[in-house]
Amino acid sequence: MSKSWRELTIAFAGIVLATKQVAQLAKTGYLKTDEFETSVRSLFERNPASTEATYGSGHNLAEAFEELEKLLNNHRDPRNADLLRYVLGVLHLQKKLIKRKEMLYVIGNRLEKAETQAQHFGITHDNVISNIAEIYTDTLSKFPYRIQVTGEATYLQQTRVASQIRVLLLAAIRSATLWRQLGGSRWQLLLYRNQMAKHTHELYLEFKR
């Protein structure tokens, strides 16, 4: 596997890691703490040593690689419908965001403040998550296009769940930005889906626990 394909696949798995948690939260109200921490930490990795370092380690993406492989091989499967919709929504929203330099500045500046707060309270402390969620609300939620999250109203109406979902969508957009910086595009997904599925499987075998 070439270095470029490896990095592209890792970054895209970062999108899947965050969006699959959105789907899980919306339907069950719960998520895996370690996966949530990986997604939140990725928001604070502005100058990582490598693409993999954005997520701490490739091992933290093992389940995301597995999920991405399923998505690439069975994208028409109704069971993948919500995840696929969230992934495509994130790619669309990120493309809008990249044209708004002032919004990017606001997000970056406020994430720096949230990182300082996380160093004091802990990365998944309620105050930290609430502040990051507000960044999403004050910026990306202002676009006419909004990602519609579907699930159980019982969970979606909970403040905790709503905040975690916004944080995860912001993390997904951060990974989408990284993916595009590495040369990723939607055309690539259409034309080289089988090749990407192959690389995803190789990475899953490398990093599965």
Curated annotation (Swiss-Prot):
Membrane topology value: Peripheral membrane protein
GO CC term, one of those recorded: cytoplasm
Sorted UniProt keywords: Cell inner membrane, Cell membrane, Cytoplasm, Membrane
Localisation per UniProt entry: Cytoplasm; Cell inner membrane
Pfam families according to UniProt: DUF489 (PF04356)
InterPro entries: HflD, HflD-like_sf
Keyword field contains Transcription: no
HAMAP family for this protein: HflD_protein
Alphabetical list of PANTHER family matching this protein: HIGH FREQUENCY LYSOGENIZATION PROTEIN HFLD
NCBIfam families the record matches: PRK00218.1-2
Record-given protein name: High frequency lysogenization protein HflD homolog
Organism (species): Saccharophagus degradans (strain 2-40 / ATCC 43961 / DSM 17024)
Lineage of origin: Bacteria, Pseudomonadati, Pseudomonadota, Gammaproteobacteria, Cellvibrionales
